[in-house]
């Protein structure tokens, strides 16, 4: 796996799924391939994206700045600086300075990542802030190691939270989660169906599923009533794909 592929993988792991994630992935690919070099336009685009947390925007802004060739005097962006200040916690800043001193002696991506993984996400973000604000300088490889370690820390906590939700025994949460997944799958079906005539059936199935979820939410139903809803939808989707000769997609 190349360095930039690894960076893209880690950064995308902290972006919520949805159309915006696909858009960000495309922007990252373009930047890494040298196709998009207008840093100012990129940062303006990033700043106005909805859904993303300030920290995720800060990390993406840091990656774009590292990768795009920019003029010396180009202004640093406030939204990135604010996101990478470690919540203003002096402890984070102290740890960030210690980490920076270690990273300055490091020259490899993996070495930097290994060192950085022993610090908290707050300290890692603060350290990125130091580098972003030109208070410190490290090699691009080392900076990318720091980025990936930060993303790994964030993705770990997101995974723990997700696992808690998936394994919860609370029937109401499980019920709502099944309906959300069914609704998301229906949306994906509609997007995949496109505008061909054969797509009408898939669109109909997806539309009915979304209406059913809306009705279940409106009238309130028994927590077990949503069981199998997403699986039924997936079966319909896969049958449609087979008929269309489309490569089977994995949503599960």
Swiss-Prot record:
UniProt keywords, alphabetically: Host nucleus, Membrane, RNA-binding, Viral matrix protein, Virion
SMART domains xref list: Flu_M1_C (SM00759)
Cross-referenced Pfam families: Flu_M1 (PF00598), Flu_M1_C (PF08289)
Bilayer-crossing regions: none
Any one Gene Ontology molecular-function term assigned to this protein's record: RNA binding
GO CC annotation terms, alphabetical: host cell nucleus; membrane; virion membrane
Places the protein is found: Virion membrane; Host nucleus
Ranges spanned by the short sequence motif Nuclear localization signal, renumbered to the chain: 101-105
GO biological process, one term: viral budding from plasma membrane
Keyword Phosphoprotein: no
Keyword RNA-binding attributed: yes
Database matches in InterPro entries: Flu_matrix_M1, Flu_matrix_M1_C, Flu_matrix_M1_N, Flu_matrix_M1_N_sub1, Flu_matrix_M1_N_sub2, INFV_M1
Region described as Membrane-binding: spans on this chain: 1-164
Positions of region (RNP-binding): 165-252
Membrane-topology annotation of the record: Peripheral membrane protein
Misc. remarks from the entry: Most abundant protein in virion. When expressed alone can form virus-like particles in transfected cells.
Summary of subunit composition and partner proteins: Homodimer and homomultimer. Interacts with NEP. Binds ribonucleocapsid by both interacting with genomic RNA and NP protein. May interact with HA and NA. Cannot bind NP without genomic RNA.
Function noted in UniProt: Plays critical roles in virus replication, from virus entry and uncoating to assembly and budding of the virus particle. M1 binding to ribonucleocapsids (RNPs) in nucleus seems to inhibit viral transcription. Interaction of viral NEP with M1-RNP is thought to promote nuclear export of the complex, which is targeted to the virion assembly site at the apical plasma membrane in polarized epithelial cells. Interactions with NA and HA may bring M1, a non-raft-associated protein, into lipid rafts. Forms a continuous shell on the inner side of the lipid bilayer in virion, where it binds the RNP. Determines the virion's shape: spherical or filamentous. Clinical isolates of influenza are characterized by the presence of significant proportion of filamentous virions, whereas after multiple passage on eggs or cell culture, virions have only spherical morphology. Filamentous virions are thought to be important to infect neighboring cells, and spherical virions more suited to spread through aerosol between hosts organisms.
Family assignment from sequence similarity: Belongs to the influenza viruses Matrix protein M1 family.
Annotated protein name in UniProt: Matrix protein 1
């Amino acid at each position: 796996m190349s360095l930039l592929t690894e960076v893209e993988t880690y950064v995308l792991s902290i972006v919520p799924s949805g159309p915006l994630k696909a858009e960000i992935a495309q922007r990252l690919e373009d930047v890494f391939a040298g196709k998009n070099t207008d840093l100012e336009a990129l940062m303006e685009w990033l700043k106005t994206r909805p859904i993303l947390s300030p920290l995720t925007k800060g990390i993406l802004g840091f990656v774009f700045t590292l990768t795009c060739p920019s003029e010396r005097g180009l202004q640093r962006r406030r939204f990135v600086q604010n996101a990478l200040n470690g919540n203003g916690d002096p402890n984070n800043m102290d740890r960030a300075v210690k980490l920076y001193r270690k990273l300055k002696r490091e020259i490899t991506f993996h070495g930097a990542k290994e060192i950085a993984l022993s610090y908290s996400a707050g300290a890692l973000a603060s350290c990125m802030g130091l580098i972003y604000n030109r208070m410190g300088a490290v090699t691009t490889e080392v900076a990318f190691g720091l980025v990936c370690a930060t993303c790994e820390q964030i993705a770990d906590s997101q995974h723990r939270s997700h696992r808690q939700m998936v394994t919860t025994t609370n029937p109401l949460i499980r019920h709502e989660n099944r309906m959300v997944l069914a609704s998301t799958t229906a949306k994906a079906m509609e997007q995949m169906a496109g505008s061909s005539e054969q797509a009408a059936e898939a669109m109909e199935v997806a539309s009915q599923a979304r209406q059913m979820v809306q009705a279940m939410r409106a009238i309130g139903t028994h927590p077990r009533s949503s069981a199998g809803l997403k699986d039924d939808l997936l079966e319909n989707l896969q049958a449609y794909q087979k008929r269309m000769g489309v490569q089977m997609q994995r949503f599960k």
